[in-house]
Amino acid sequence: MLIDDFLNYLRYERNYSNYTIGAYSKDLDQFQRYVREHREGVFDPGEIDSDFVRSWIVSLMDEKLSPVSVNRKLSSLKSFFKFLMKRGIVSANPLRLVSGPKTKKPLPYFIKDSELEALLDGDGFDEDFEGVRNRLVIEMLYDTGMRRSELIGIRNVDVDYEAMQGKVTGKRNKQRLIPFAEGLKNLMLAYTEVRDREVEAAGEWFFVRKNGNQLSTGIVYNIVKKQLSEIPMLAKRSPHVLRHSFATSMLNNGAELNAVKDLLGHSSLASTSVYTHTTFEELKKVYHAHPRAQKE
C-alpha cells in the first residue's frame, strides 16, 4: 500500500513518466520481497535500519548486479523513504548513512560524423514504408538529439513545417521546441507521404507501425541497433548513442554548452558537461598527431 501511494505521488504530483515509475516499482518490489524473506513476511519500513539496507546491498552484489544497477536501486529506495518521512510514516531515512558501491563513470559513446553520414547516405534502408520510417528515425535522433521516448511521443500536430520546429515532451512532462533543418524537413514530408498512402489506420501519432499504432521504445531500440550494426567496430548500438553523437558533434563544431543543454532538454549544465570530456579526448588525439607531440 505504501509503495502504491509513493508511485501515485510520482505519477500525479511529480509527473514522472510511466517508464520511470515502472523502474521505481520494480526496485521497490524487489526490496519488499527481500524484507519479507528476512522479517517473517512482514514489511514495516519503520523497522528498517542502515545495517539491514547494507545487507540488501551485499545480496545484490552476490547476484552479480553491476554497481550502476545497485546504486539505481538505492536511489529508488532513498526517494521512497524521503516520501515516507514527509508523510510522517517513518522518523528517519535509513539510507542517510549508506553508501553504494563505487562506479567508474565511462565517457559517452559517440559515432563520428563521417560514419553516420556514410550510413544515412548508403543503401542500407529499404524503399518501402518501414525503410523510409527507419531512416527518418535514425536521422531525427541524430539531427536533434532527442530521446527515443520523446520521438515516439511526437504527434502530427506537434510538427510545424513552416516554422521548421517540433514540440517534444521530455522528462517530467516538460515540453520544449526542437528546430530542424531543411534536409530533415524533406525527409519528414517524404515519410508522411508514404505513411498516409500505405497505412490506413494512421491517427494522431507521427511515427507509427504498419497497423497505425504508435511506435514503442522497444521498436525504436531495435531499429537503431539493426541499422548501427552496419558501422564496423562500434562498441555500443542504441538510441542514446545517437543522442551522445549529436551533443558531441555540436560541441566539436563550436556550439555553446548552454545551447546544447537546452537542445537536449537537460535541467542543469552538469548533465551536459560530460560531453566536454569527450570533445577534450578528440582534442588530445589531434594534439598527439602533431609531430612534436610524438617525441619522447
List where the protein language model places each region.
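Conserved catalytic core of the tyrosine transesterase superfamily
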Residues: 1-296
